[in-house]
Structures are given as C-alpha cells and as structure tokens.
Curated annotation (Swiss-Prot):
Organism listed in the record: Candida albicans (strain SC5314 / ATCC MYA-2876)
Subcellular location: Peroxisome matrix
Name the UniProt record assigns to this protein: Peroxisomal catalase
Listed cofactors: heme
Keywords: Heme, Hydrogen peroxide, Iron, Metal-binding, Oxidoreductase, Peroxidase, Peroxisome
Positions annotated as active site in the UniProt record: H53, N126
Job of this protein: Catalyzes the degradation of hydrogen peroxide (H(2)O(2)) generated by peroxisomal oxidases to water and oxygen, thereby protecting cells from the toxic effects of hydrogen peroxide.
Listed EC numbers: 1.11.1.6
Entry's family note: Belongs to the catalase family.
SMART domains for this protein: Catalase
Length: 485
C-alpha cells in the first residue's frame, strides 16, 4: 500500500501543490499551513558543513578479529578470534567543501565507528601515516591556508606554500601529499593510518604505545595529477560513485588491520618522539602485527541521516584503549565533540548512526537540550542519587603509568634538521618505483607555479633540504610554467 501524503503533524493533504488564496489569482492566506510548513522546513534543511572533511562517503560493514592480541589489548570486542563487530566507515577529503571534487590532491579521512558491546569506539584516521603539524595551536592557521583567500575567495598558492615553507616540520607529509599517494584512485584502494600514537593495555596492567594500520586488500592504486584533474572536471563525485556502486554490486572492499607497538622503555630509546605526528615508526624495528579484518558490505539508505550526520571523535574510546600524550591528539579529544555539538546539536549521540547499539548509555546528569528524543531517562533523578543504586564497572588494572614532571610552560615544537630525515628516506624509497620521483617533482611544480617568485624560491629551498636533485627538478619545471621577466 502506498503511503498517504501528509504535512508534518500527520494531517492528510489532498492536493500538495494547491495554495489557499483569495479567489484563483488573489493574495495567499497565512493560514495555509501546508505551504508555510513546507517553506519553513525548506529554509532550515541545511546544517553547517564540517569545517574540514566536508565532502565524504560512507558505508556499514563488519570487523572480525583474526589474531589474538590480548597480550596487548584487553578490549572486549578483541577478546576472541572470530568475534565480529558492526562498523560504519566514512571516507573524505580534508580541505574541500561539500561540492568539491573527490579526486583533489588532499589527504583522505578514514574514520571508523565500532559499535561494540562496551560503547562506540571511533578510530578517526587518515590515508597518510603522518601529518603537517605537531603543535595543535597551528591547526586553524594551517587549515585556513588550505582553503580560500579571504579577499578573493580563491584557492591561493601563495598562502599554501608560505605556510608550509615557514613550518618545515610539514615536509614529510608534503612529500606524501604530492606523491601519487595524494590522489588515490578510489577510497577502496588506499590504506588508513592512525598517525597518532595511542595507549592500549592488557588485563595484567601492562600498557603499550600503539600505531594502527588498515591495509587495503584491494591494493594501492593512484591517479596521476592529470588523471585526477580530468576526473575532477568530468565526474567530481567519482569516489562516492565508485564506493556505492561496488558495494551495491556485491564487490565488497576490505582492509586488514595491523598494529605496531612500543613499550615505554623502547619509546625512550627511539630516535624520535612517539608523540610526533610528523614521524613514522620504521617497520623493520617495529614490525606490523595483524589483528583483524573489516569489510564494508552495506550502503547507507539515506546520505544525510547516516553520512552527513555521522559524528566521530578520538575521545570515543572503550576500556583498555586510551589516547597518548600526543599534543595534536589531545586537542582533537576536545575539538571533535565540540564541532559536532555545533553542527548537530548537544544530543548528537542520540542520532541513530551515532547511538551505541548496547542502549546502555546511563549518565543521568547529561539531560535535556535540543532534540532529546530518547526518553530522557524518564523519572530518574538528574544526578547520581544515593537512593538509586548504580554499578561502577572497574576495567583498568594499570598501576604503572607515565610520570610527568615539570613546570607549566608554553612550548613550540620547532622544526630542526632532523625533521628532514624521514622525508629524505622517502625520496630514496620513491626511486624504487618507476617514475615516482619524477611525478613528485612534477606535481609540486605544477602547484608551486601559481605562487609568486619569492614564494617559489622558498619552495626550492624547502625541498633542497630533502634533495638537491628534487629541488632542481621542481625549479626547472616551475620556471618553464611561469617564466620570470
């Protein structure tokens, strides 16, 4: 049976396109609730877009434990090989707006929500293992340079390269971004990385620093700069279409999950800080260890309800998993939930895609607010009342934690020559693959050619600290593309 058309209060409407008026061609009547209701709702359809990661695609799936890592982490959803957990993953670009191209040269967001029996776990990752900054106060400045000039409202190569060359700790991520990894062929054919260091613990009270890797079972495929640009013009929703159609056709993408681990003693001996988001952990010294696999096998039924309203936060953890002292991660613990309250409202966790499946959310002091739709805990007191028994579940046996000692001090983690070491190693790695060094130099040159000469000279010097061959190749093409008088 077909549904009956109604207005928002459920009243049947016999003619949806008729409007009440004085005669057939007279003025409209304010009492026409169908018209007023429809227009008022239309005026409020849009919510604020994400300030970063605005353009995205998502799908549901399942995570399965493939290997026992209970010696590292006692999280309940990992306690048994073969155990399965429902998930929702959202992929995204970072800098573009909602209508921007999926193939833009940009990092890709790779956020996954695990609906576990002990609450929702959000792993909010990217497709690159490092990032541009390690001082969180730089984040708003950095993002502004990746967006639009406030005067012209155009993307601005001067802003872009002025910031990066002034903050040289960015070099490693910039090398990744301007390699062909910066333009993935699809969301299915890219990896995901925690980037940040986390702390996981076992039931003995032992804890470990952890980095997580999601390795695409489809392999890595990329686009050249020219291929990505052509697709941006011909099909800006290319990655969204690819993901949706493949899942609809039963071609379910999957990723294998690995961890790298360090003890506190190993971290103290490492040649870099485990809290430095601009560095990777060498695989030879800190090998990958498999623990699971996840498959995306179900498309959303409604994009707005399930993808646009999906809200992830690294502060959403489960027992035996916690953040490290990584300063950028620490700032994200606040910022993500704060932006969701702005975009979606104070009760964003009641939206179905964000709601824990256990139904076991009990925090009686967090009540009321706009769009409270879950019963609001009924008649229960809105505080922890002494006459209402509450269970407090103990889950952590950790006794031996990090010890921090020092005065409160403002600290700017400035770049040093050591920040170019891993970028130099990446340059050598690219030589192993056909044309990848040439593609990197070309991709940088095409972008930097749009900057002023003074900024271009800083770009040449910036990459010269990685390799003079790289800097020379960039300079040669830049001057061909934008000859100087």
């Amino acid at each position: 049976m077909a549904p009956t058309f109604t207005n928002s209060n459920g009243q049947p409407i016999p003619e949806p396109f008729a409007t009440q008026r004085v005669g057939q061609h007279g003025p409209l009547l304010l009492q026409d609730f169908n018209l007023i209701d429809s227009l008022a709702h239309f005026d409020r359809e849009r919510i604020p877009e994400r300030v970063v990661h605005a353009k995205g695609s998502g799908a549901y799936g399942v995570f399965e434990v493939t290997d026992d890592i209970t010696d590292i982490c006692a999280a309940k959803f990992l306690d048994t090989v073969g155990k399965k957990t429902r998930i929702f993953t959202r992929f995204s670009t970072v800098g573009g707006e909602l209508g921007s191209a999926d193939t833009a040269r940009d990092p890709r967001g790779f956020a996954t929500k695990f609906y576990t029996e002990e609450g929702n776990l959000d792993l909010v990752y990217n497709n690159t293992p490092v990032f541009f900054i390690r001082d969180p106060s730089k984040f708003p400045h950095f993002i502004h340079t990746q967006k639009r000039n406030p005067e012209t409202h155009l993307k601005d190569a001067n802003m872009f390269w002025d910031y990066l060359t002034s903050n040289e700790e960015s070099i490693h991520q910039v090398m990744v971004l301007f390699s062909d990894r910066g333009t993935p062929a699809s969301y299915r054919e890219m990896n995901g990385y925690s980037g940040h260091t986390y702390k996981w613990s076992n039931k003995k009270g032992e804890w470990f620093y952890v980095q997580v890797h999601f390795i695409s079972d489809q392999g890595i495929k990329t686009l050249t700069n020219e291929e990505a640009g052509a697709l941006a013009g011909s099909n800006p929703d290319y990655a969204q279409e690819d993901l949706f159609k493949n899942i609809a056709a039963g071609n379910y993408p999957s990723w294998t999950a690995y961890i790298q681990t360090m003890t506190e003693a190993e971290a103290k001996e490492a040649e870099f800080s485990v809290f430095d988001l601009t560095k990777v952990w060498p695989h030879k010294k800190y090998p990958l260890r498999r623990f699971g696999k996840f498959t995306l096998n179900e498309n959303p039924k409604n994009y707005f309800a399930e993808v646009e309203q999906a809200a992830f936060s690294p502060a959403h953890t489960v027992p035996y998993m916690e953040p490290s002292a990584d300063p950028v991660l620490q700032s994200r613990l606040f910022s993500y939930a704060d932006t969701h309250r702005h975009r979606l409202g104070t009760n964003y966790t009641q939206i179905p895609v964000n709601c824990p499946v256990t139904g076991a959310v009990f925090n009686p002091h967090m009540r009321d607010g706009a769009m409270t739709v879950n019963g609001n805990l009924g008649s229960h007191p809105n505080y922890l009342a002494s006459d209402k028994p509450v269970e407090f579940k103990q889950f952590s046996l950790q006794e031996d934690q990090e010890v921090w000692n020092g005065a409160a001090t403002p600290f700017h983690w400035k770049a040093t020559p050591a920040d170019f070491k891993q970028a130099q190693e990446l340059w050598k790695v690219l030589k192993r693959y056909p044309n990848q060094q040439e593609h990197l130099a070309h991709n940088i040159a095409v972008h930097a050619a749009g900057a002023d000469a003074a900024i271009q000279d800083r770009v040449f010097a910036y990459f010269g600290k990685v390799s003079q061959d790289l800097a020379d190749a960039i300079k040669k093409e830049v001057l061909e593309l934008s000859p100087r008088k």
